[in-house]
Design a protein with these regions (language model features):
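Structured core elements
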Residues: 22-23, 40, 75, 82, ...
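Hydrophobic, well-ordered secondary-structure elements that form the walls
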Residues: 39, 76, 93, 128, ...
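Phosphate-binding active sites in nucleotide-utilizing proteins
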Residues: 3-55, 61-66
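Amide-donor transfer/coupling interface in amidating biosynthetic enzymes
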Residues: 100-185
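Short, glycine-/Ser/Thr-/acidic-enriched flexible segments
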Residues: 1-3, 28-29, 44-47, 80-81, ...
Length: 185
């Protein structure tokens, strides 16, 4: 429910690469399924479910422990928000050193180019969100996002932490298969 925005083509690409998709619910389940080799948290509306997500302490702890232990993870948009310290001061997983707050207006919308400052690679994507983030403490963002139609418009966004890559941008895995392979090795 809280995370339901996935490109069907991304899920198909993962399965074609031999990845077994194991569904679970951060709202209903008490912990991550056993034996996972990676975690993919898609977009959605965690702000609508923030109280229930926060109340599921055992799931939040399970995810944080798995990520701190090195489980590879890709979290986009709502999934990234869930991994943050909080959404509108409601406690979330607390793995990513940032806070999220909902705004009354659309913050980003449309096609973008995501430049990964650590690898130097650029990926096409799209953003659509009403949330804003603020890095906490010494944290810094690892991506530069540019509006595809107006490349002079750019902003920081997204980060790597351990084996986790997270950001607002929704990427289409087939546009850059090496990116998908790097994530799930």
């Amino acid at each position: 429910k809280a995370f339901s925005f996935y490109y069907r083509a991304n899920l198909d690409a993962l399965e074609a690469a031999g990845v077994e998709l194991v569904p679970f619910s951060p709202l209903e389940d008490g912990e991550l399924p056993k034996g996972l080799d990676g975690l993919y948290l898609g977009g959605g509306f965690p702000e609508v479910f923030k109280v229930r997500l926060s109340a599921n302490i055992s799931m939040r702890q399970s995810i944080r422990t798995a990520l701190e232990s090195g489980l590879p993870c890709y979290a986009e948009c709502g999934g990234m928000m869930y991994l943050s310290e909080s959404i509108d001061s409601t406690e979330m997983v607390g793995f990513l050193p940032q806070v999220c707050r909902m705004t009354d207006r659309l913050q980003r919308f449309g096609y973008v180019l995501v430049a990964d400052l650590k690898t130097g690679r650029t990926y096409p994507a799209h953003e659509f969100h009403h949330a804003a983030t603020e890095a906490a403490g010494e944290a810094a963002y690892d991506f530069e996002i540019r509006k595809a139609s107006r490349p002079e418009l750019c902003w920081p966004g997204g980060m790597h932490k351990g084996n986790t890559t997270a950001g607002f941008a929704h990427l289409h895995f087939l546009s850059h298969p090496e990116w998908m392979e790097r994530l799930w090795r």
